[in-house]
């Protein structure tokens, strides 16, 4: 079997290419998180009179701008609450502005809220959305939001898989998602596009970065229907189940 040996000059050249490639990856990740600053928002929700299964109080989460002409921001339904609530939104280093609920789907845990485009800061931008492809296992991602009130911060990880164990179909990721991250973007670190909405983490004391995000492909379908003036709400059946038969 013939063995090839790199000449010293060629070896140095290969090392330089690898070093340059690594630096480009680092710079790209930094730019992607920097871009997230301009479309991610902080959301404060105040609930005084909650519906059943909701709670009264003040809650915080994240969201991101998806339609700058309409002023639409995407987040989780549990961030803004299905109960009557006061929802306020702030871009980075900006003051809070009152937001209006446009659409809420508790099954998908999806909400679309709206603020006036006049309230946008000059450096705002609309998030690029991945509306067609599902990321494969191993795809590098970044979660962005406000974990434990550490505002506008990011974490990194990979896509661990896609699961339907939670009722709906979710992306599973080991990128840390904590309280305050809910509703924020899960971003592809290859393309810079938002591929999901950070939604939850596995509720177990032994959990080590088993976290979940709503697939952006479903969110894009809802946005498309809303832009067309159609109601994207799932159909409702007018009956209920009883745990015990009537006597």
Region annotations inferred by a language model:
Residues 28-31, 48-70, 95-98, 183, ...:
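A conserved glycine-rich beta-strand in the N-terminal activation segment of trypsin-fold
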Residues 27-35, 99, 117-123, 194-247:
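C-terminal cap/linker of serine protease catalytic domains
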Residues 76-81, 155, 179, 196-204, ...:
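Short beta->alpha transition motifs characteristic of CBS
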Residues 64-65, 177-198:
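Catalytic nucleophile loop of clan PA
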Residues 12-21:
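Bacterial N-terminal signal peptides
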Residues 2-12:
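Bacterial N-terminal signal peptides that target proteins for export
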Residues 35-50, 141:
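A short, Trp-centered hydrophobic/proline-enriched beta-strand micro-motif
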Residues 68-145, 149-152, 167-170, 230-234:
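Conserved active-site neighborhood of the chymotrypsin/trypsin-like protease fold
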């Amino acid at each position: 079997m013939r063995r090839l040996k790199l000449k010293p000059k060629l070896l140095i050249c290969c090392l330089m290419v690898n070093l340059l490639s690594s630096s480009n990856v680092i710079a790209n990740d930094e730019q992607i998180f920097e871009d997230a600053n301009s479309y991610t928002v902080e959301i404060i929700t105040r609930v005084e009179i909650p519906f059943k299964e909701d709670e009264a109080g003040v809650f915080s989460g994240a969201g991101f701008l998806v339609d700058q002409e309409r002023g639409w921001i995407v987040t989780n339904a549990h961030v803004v609450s299905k109960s009557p609530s006061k929802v306020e939104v702030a871009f980075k280093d900006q003051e809070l502005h009152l937001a209006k609920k446009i659409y809420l789907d508790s099954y998908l845990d999806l909400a679309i809220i709206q603020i006036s485009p006049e309230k946008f800061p000059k450096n705002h931008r609309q998030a690029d959305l991945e509306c067609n492809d599902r990321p494969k296992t191993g795809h590098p991602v970044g979660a962005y939001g406000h974990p434990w009130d550490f505002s506008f911060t990011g974490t990194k990880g990979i896509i661990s898989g896609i699961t339907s164990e939670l009722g709906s179909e979710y992306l599973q990721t080991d990128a840390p998602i904590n309280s305050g991250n809910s509703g924020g973007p899960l971003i592809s670190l290859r393309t810079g596009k938002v591929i999901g909405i950070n939604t939850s983490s596995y509720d177990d004391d032994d959990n080590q970065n088993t976290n979940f995000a709503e697939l952006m492909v479903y969110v894009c379908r809802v946005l498309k229907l809303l832009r067309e003036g159609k109601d994207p709400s799932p159909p409702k059946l007018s009956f209920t189940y009883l745990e015990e038969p009537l006597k």
